[in-house]
Amino acid sequence: MRELLGKRMIAITGAAAGADGVFLKTCVELRIPAIVILPFPEERFARDFEDAEEWAMTRRLCGVALAKYVAPGCHGAPEAYQVVSRLLLEWADAFLFVWNGRPPEGAGGTGETVDEARDLGIPSRIIDAAGFAASWQTPPEPGRKARHGFPSRAELLDFLDARFPARLDGPIDPAHG
């Protein structure tokens, strides 16, 4: 992905239990700035995690993100996850999916987002969830330009601040994980 997007790469991700958390942790470890879009306010989002330790780790990782937003609408699940997927589809220049290869199981799931990224022609690298083999679903075109070329992180964040009703910044409250 760095070869495709260059050193100015910024990750934009959800933070759902499972692969989203692994991706976010990898971004932190590799020092890739990440913008996180949550489907709900944190108090509600926490209920979607069966494992309290996984939720605590997700909160810590979100706390070091470049920025954290709540998707507009605060719909119920799975619609809220679909809103996050739509926002990611709208803004991502490329995707990295960890996917089991199964057909879509519902609104906002990985299978649905994989299909939509393919239909939109967004370069997408898929890592097989079982064997971890990686392949391009939609390979990048040579010389492809970014769909959204913001000259600086500040301009990107200003744009997102204007778009989202809620930006959640600041340190994690230790009392909540």
Where are these regions (language model features)?
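Acidic/glycine-enriched connector segments
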Residues: 1-174
